[in-house]
Amino acid sequence: MSFKPLHDRIAIKPIENEEKTKGGIIIPDTAKEKPMQGEIVAVGNGVLNKNGEIHPLELKVGDKVLYGKWAGTEIEIKGEKLIVMKESDVFGIIN
């Protein structure tokens, strides 16, 4: 991928929800909720603190994370859908 977020932004590849329930019912696209978890595929360098030093991000490429339902901006690069958001929009890392 040739996308590098700036400052405290990260790029996340959403992990799609199951298309079928445990009982075998197929869920149409219109009824699916927006995924709220994904894998980080790119991170910015960090933000400048009051002293002019760059404070690096805590998250790193490969982390699986939970984020807010309406967080970020959806983009598409080379056919791949990504969500770009600030690191602070992430709730936490999934182990």
Curated annotation (Swiss-Prot):
It is found in: Cytoplasm. Gene3D superfamilies: GroES chaperonin (2.30.33.40). Its main location: cytoplasm. Keywords: Chaperone, Cytoplasm. PANTHER family: 10 KDA HEAT SHOCK PROTEIN, CO-CHAPERONIN GROES. Belongs to the GroES chaperonin family. This is Co-chaperonin GroES. It comes from Rickettsia prowazekii (strain Madrid E).
